[in-house]
């Protein structure tokens, strides 16, 4: 299921890939939103 947290995470990952934000921001979002980093990203399914 794609919810708002996965959408935000995908956007943050794209920004980090471009170098616009630090990777730690992505890690902080994962912790804050309680996202299981081992779970497959539903946007990629």
Swiss-Prot record:
Q: Which cofactor does it need?
A: thiamine diphosphate
Gene Ontology MF term list = pyruvate dehydrogenase (acetyl-transferring) activity
InterPro entries xrefs: Transketo_C/PFOR_II
Task: Tell me the enzyme class.
Answer: oxidoreductase
- Reply yes or no: does the keyword Transferase apply: no
- Domain of life the protein comes from: Bacteria
Keywords linked to the UniProt accession: Oxidoreductase, Pyruvate, Thiamine pyrophosphate
EC numbers on record: 1.2.4.1
- Give the catalytic activity: N(6)-[(R)-lipoyl]-L-lysyl-[protein] + pyruvate + H(+) = N(6)-[(R)-S(8)-acetyldihydrolipoyl]-L-lysyl-[protein] + CO2
| Binding partners and assembly | Homodimer.
Its job: The pyruvate dehydrogenase complex catalyzes the overall conversion of pyruvate to acetyl-CoA and CO(2). It contains multiple copies of three enzymatic components: pyruvate dehydrogenase (E1), dihydrolipoamide acetyltransferase (E2) and lipoamide dehydrogenase (E3).
Indicate what this protein is called per its UniProt record. Pyruvate dehydrogenase E1 component
Q: Which organism is it from?
A: Azotobacter vinelandii
